[in-house]
Amino acid sequence: MAGLVNINIEFKELATSFIQRSKAGIVAIILKDTTKMYKELTSEDDIPISLSADNKKYIKYGFVGATDNEKVLRPSKVIISTFTEDGKVEDILEELESVEFNYLCMPEAIEAEKTKIVTWIKKIREEESTEAKAVLANIKADNEAIINFTENVVVDGEEITAEKYTTRVASLIASTPNTQSITYAPLDEVESIVKIDKASADAKVQAGELILRRLSGKIRIARGINSLTTLTAEKGEIFQKIKLVDTKDLISKDIKNIYVEKYLRKCPNTYDNKCLFIVAVQSYLTELAKQELIDSNFTVEIDLEKQKEYLEGKKIAVSKMKENEIKEANTGSNGFYLINLKLVDAMEDINIRVQM
């Protein structure tokens, strides 16, 4: 029972720190340089002097961050991984598989490298249940984990391509708390962009492009959306919003981490303990509802569908079992939970499955 008491404490701490953690994201940058290196930086002062001038500039963009009521918010860390002309982006991606980050970017990526990054992000999100996402330029990925930035900008009189500005965009997103959206967030250093009319801007947004617009005297993010354009019953409009995907990802991460670290390792996987774990998750979500991150009408329960699949795989005649018998059935070391919740500013429910 002590293990479950600790779980409640852990969930309370995670709920309390949710907003703070959401605005202290980690940006990972893949760079091409003359030497191979991997570094984790916490400020511009940590930038290696041996890097090229362009690479130093990309990293500085990664530390610009966001503003909240005139307070500057920055990523908690910028990770850089470089490779030489003899190297391959696949090697860097393999290296990053064991690294925790929120947003990946590659300011000098060619088309083939962008495609490989998209494929890799999709794979690790599916296989590893990671919250990793990427900010790339001019690529129609049609995926909630890929932000497609398509705007060239002028900074200090110099035109900067969308590709080379992805580190700045990643920094903005990673530093914005989940209580806010990046929609209309200003990019104060940008002096000008190519002017387009509202209809053209709306069409770009509908096509899953993250673009900039001049509004109220400043150049701002037009709409905080990712590249997802194909909507399904499982992935509706809320999956197009960067803020909501970030919130969903962090909730999933918190619950799964506590489940693995504090529940599976310390508590027998009995039905009674599963119910106590559900109560702990409910308490965590209640705290998030108080912070207006999710709606208060949520449910947490044993995932009957997945439970049935597990039992059928064990050659158990599920058709002859009552619902309560299925819920209470022994699932070995596996746990199947279904969370239904509504993220604030969304009009539809989402399901989060926790399966271990």
Swiss-Prot record:
Compartment(s) where it occurs, according to its Swiss-Prot or TrEMBL record: Virion; Host cytoplasm
This protein's UniProt keywords: Host cytoplasm, Viral contractile tail ejection system, Viral genome ejection through host cell envelope, Viral penetration into host cytoplasm, Viral tail protein, Viral tail sheath protein, Virion, Virus entry into host cell
GO CC term (a single one): virus tail, sheath
Pfam families per UniProt: Phage_sheath_1, Phage_sheath_1C
Keyword GTP-binding (UniProt): no
Domain of life of the native organism: Viruses
Assembly description: Homomultimer.
Function: Polymerizes as an extended structure around the baseplate-tail tube complex. During ejection, the sheath shifts to a contracted form, thereby making the inner tail tube protrude through the host cell envelope.
Protein name as it appears in the record: Tail sheath protein
Organism of derivation: Clostridium phage phiCD119 (strain Clostridium difficile/United States/Govind/2006)
Lineage: Viruses, Duplodnaviria, Heunggongvirae, Uroviricota, Caudoviricetes
